[in-house]
Each structure stands twice: as structure tokens, then as C-alpha cells.
Amino acid sequence: MTPPWITLNHPFPPALPVLPLGARAQKRYFGAMSVNITFLGGSGTVTGSKYLVSHAGQQLLVDCGLFQGFKQLRLRNWSPLPVPASEVDAVLLTHAHLDHSGYLPLMYRQGYRGKVHATAATCDLCAILLPDSGHLQEEDAAFLNRHGYTKHAPAQPLYSKHDALLSLHLLHPVSWGKPFAPLPGWQATFTSAGHILGASSILLEVAGRRILFSGDVGRPDDLIMN
């Protein structure tokens, strides 16, 4: 099943750092233009990267990752987002690792139908990783039910392989170094971050503000990156 890739390109606007915040979802307002960043993950812990940027009634999510590791962290994947998925207007992915992309199938199941912008390599990797993640979620639930290791009746997967396959149709590839408009009045520019194939840093510009999301960085000279 090949998702209908679409590339968007538009013109645009100009400086501000993202400040480190605590482990819980926290907000930071930047001046009268009220650009609001809510840290939903990747803060206080490495995994679960989700950064909700809000302005003038529009909401854009940078990364959509799963919490991984200890049980207390994994349980956070079952908590609803503070904003209904259907009210998020666009998603940008820095790269395909599940702690940055693995929540997408759940977003789809919760009603998100907007575009998910990522490099072509990230889209291709997500087409492998997300269905595999859904399959493993189903396998884990089946194992718990088969051996009676669950307090729930029955244990359910966080999402299914089918959910993951459906979510792939939201992916829209973008190119490095080519600014585009993920939403009216917003500009995003992806640049190479090394790390893995397709990994990007994302410069987001809105309301005269510039916010750089580095994503995961490193190893830009590995042969596989070239």
C-alpha cells in the first residue's frame, strides 16, 4: 500500500530559543504575539517527543513519539493528549525513530486527519517501523491474554497494525532546504541533522518568531547518510 505522497512549497517571514522546561507538559508564552509551546514529552525524559506549538487558534505538533522504557513511562502513552487529536492542524516529524513518530497511529485512531510532513526517507522508514510497531503491540497483548498476565479483561494493544497502515496515508514528504507552509501564516524549513536517514532539524517561523527544533543529531558523515 503506497501512501499518496504530496510535497508543498510556499513563500514566507523572521528569533527565539526554546527554553528547557520540566518533565510535565509546560507552556511558555512569547510576547504579545502569543506563540505558545507545550512540551508533551521529550522533557524530563528522552522519549515521547511531542511539542505542541499554538498560535491564533492553530495548533501544530512537532514530533509524535511514543514513551519508551520503564513501565511508568510507557503508561503515559495511554493518557489522552491535552488537545483532542482532531483539533491538531498539522504534524512535522524530525525523523522516524518510534520515540519521535510512534504515536501517529494512535493520533489517527483518535481522529487526526491532517498532514504529517517529513522527509521522503523518514516517510519510507515510517512505512516499515509503524506497522511493525502495531504488530508488536498486538503480539504483546495476545501474549498477556494467553498467559493470564494482565489485570485487564482482555489486554488491548495501544494500537493495531491496521491503525498504523491507515496513518501512513497522512505522510507528505518534504525536501531539505525548501521552506513550505504547513499552515497558513506558518513556514517550516527542514535541514539535515545526521543521526539516521532522513533525520532533520526543523526551523519553524510564525508570527515573527523563529523556533528551531534540533531533533536528534550526530554522525552526519556516516557513509549511509551520503
Question: Whereabouts are the PLM-identified features?
Answer:
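Pre-active-site segment of Zn-dependent metallo-hydrolases
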Residues: 43-45, 55-114, 118-171, 217-226
